[in-house]
Amino acid sequence: MRFSQRKGLVPATKVVQRESIDDDLRASLWNLLTLFYWRKFQGRDEDTYRSDEVAGSNLEVLMYSIWINHFKQPIDTIELYWQNCLRRLRDYFFDGQWYEVYDFVEFIAQNGDASSRDRFIEACNKHLERENSAYRFVNGQITEITSQQEIEEIESAIQRSDSFPGGINALKGRARVNVQQD
């Protein structure tokens, strides 16, 4: 607990963020995107005038996927240089509605570098919990939850149902219905 919370100057706990994202949560999620994905940018190895072009970089395929499948915009609107592209992504992220932020984070988790996926999702869940969000990643999707116990129960049930053909889809549907009814 911070000094200001102990002194009663600011609330000790935040209101659950169900249909909103405050600045702290938004910044936390952006920082995770930066640490797990954006900072890993590597331009092409060729001798070129600039090495920060998106084309030929390790993030080129992800940028195409974002523009084609998430933004649904023409790929010729992707910025040529990484810093400009990153600025555009950042503006979208910080200017977007709360649900657009979750859509974007979920999209990156599902389409970004697979080697970072599990650690990224784990880090997101820690920050979502810390910032009192009503959402967590469950089975690769951002889902509304009510408690840590509920997350563990859903994930455990999904893992158990993998041994029963067809069971996973029924369980996933039931979990979504139960969580949304709260």
Regions found by a protein language model. Give the residues of each.
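Internal, Lys/Arg-enriched amphipathic helical interaction segments that engage polyanionic partners
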Residues: 43-173
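Long, contiguous, compositionally biased segments that the model treats as domain-scale units
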Residues: 1-53
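A cyclin-like helical interaction fold
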Residues: 174-178
